Structure formats: C-alpha cells, structure tokens
Amino acid sequence: GIKQNSAISNMTKAGDKSFNALLIGTDAAGENTDALMIVHVDKQDKKIRMLSIPRDTRVTVDGKKFKINACYHLGGLELLIEKIRELTDIDINYYASIEPGTLGEIVDCLGGVEYDVEQDMHYSDPAQDLYINLKKGKQILDGDKAEQYCRYRSYVMGDITRTQSQQKFFKALFEQKLNIKYATKINDIYDIMCEKVKTNVSMKDIIFNMSVLEIISSGEQIECYDAPGNYNDMEKDGVSYYLIEDEHVIELKTLCAQFFGGSYV
C-alpha cells in the first residue's frame, strides 16, 4: 500500500467544499525538496489554485537560518509543513512527496502533455543523474521530457521563473488530463503512487474528490500565484536566500486567506 507517515496523523481532514494539497518534489537523494507547490481545490467555486514556495526561501530552525528545501532533511514532513504553515497560515490536508522519475511515469501513463516550451534548454548534472536537452516550441512532452522541463534551473531569473514554469506545466497537465475520459487511468496512477509516492491520499479520498474532474472544463478555472518576496545578496555564509519577510509575509498570508482557505485575519 501507500507509504503513510504517522507523524502527520494530526493533519486537518479535508472539508466537503475545499482542500489543500502539498506537492513535494524531492531531489535524487530524497533528502532535500526540489519543488514545493500548494494546490487548493475549491469545489464550491469550481477553481483550482496553485501557489509555489521557492526552494531558496529562508526559514529559521532552532535559531539557525536554512533554505526551506532543507526542512525535509532536517525534520521530515512535519517540519516542512510547520514552516509552510508559519509562512501562509493555511492547513494542509493532503501531501504527496514525489521522487525524480515519478512525474514522468504519471505523464507517460496519461499519454504525454501537449506543451509550448519557451526556450531551448540544455543542462547536465551527473551527480543528480540529470540530463536536459529540450528544444523550444510546441510539442508533446513524454514523461522523460516533462521531468527535464520541470527540473530545469538555468533561468536568468533563477528559481522564480522555475516555479512559474512548473506551475504552467501543471496547469497544462491538469487542463488536459483531469478529465472524466482519463478516469479509467486512476488505478494505474494509484499503482504508481503506491510504489513511488509518500502520501496520505487513499483510494477513498480519490473517489470522494472525483468531482474535481468536473472543475477543469476550461483553463480559466486554474489560477497560479507566486509567493511575494525578493532575493537577498549573498550572506556571510555565501548563501543567497529568497526572503518572505515583514510586509511580504502579510501579503502572502492575506493572499492565502483570500484564495487558499487561510486563517489570517
């Protein structure tokens, strides 16, 4: 069955009207998070909203500064969700931690995603077993190419453009594949999840939330948001962080209260 995590048993149960799911992409070692995206499904307003938290976001753990992508390694899901809650004031109902290769398997299972790649992408990192070679333009991304696209990092604007690109890809994936005609694939996808994904989503949850498939009749139903903040210059430790502080925290919490069921007043 699916690898459950008992430490997260105190997570809030999803309501009938909406829920928040945290998508976590881990690196090849499975230690740090490579991507963090909150997906809010509003069944009442028939909307799906996505919010990405940049992996370089600075957080404090036991009085020390870290990038949020280290939380998974430092204190597991519990610490990661705690830090996301500190930044956003939202409850996470579901989580799915995805290792490299898993997204590709799901994309292949669904027959690829039609996508317009914005630029030529070339990158290689043998340590991560990551080799990217994509051409600009409209194409069908199979699983391998979808993985390459979502893991590409050499943007001029760095992580911000990367999170926007990941959102854009997931928007295309949801629009094209969250469709009743792909409902027959649910068992296959669930099998992949059982093998490769750490999650608290059960088959019962999937069936309970099947109405989500009806939401995605048009692209206007999917909205993407960025976490407000800015990059600082290199600190004394030689690390550059993305800062969500002071007015940006208030801005983010206000955004989350408005669109992600957050509790900030």
Ranges and model annotations:
Residues G1-V265:
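Non-catalytic, solvent-exposed segments at the cell envelope interface
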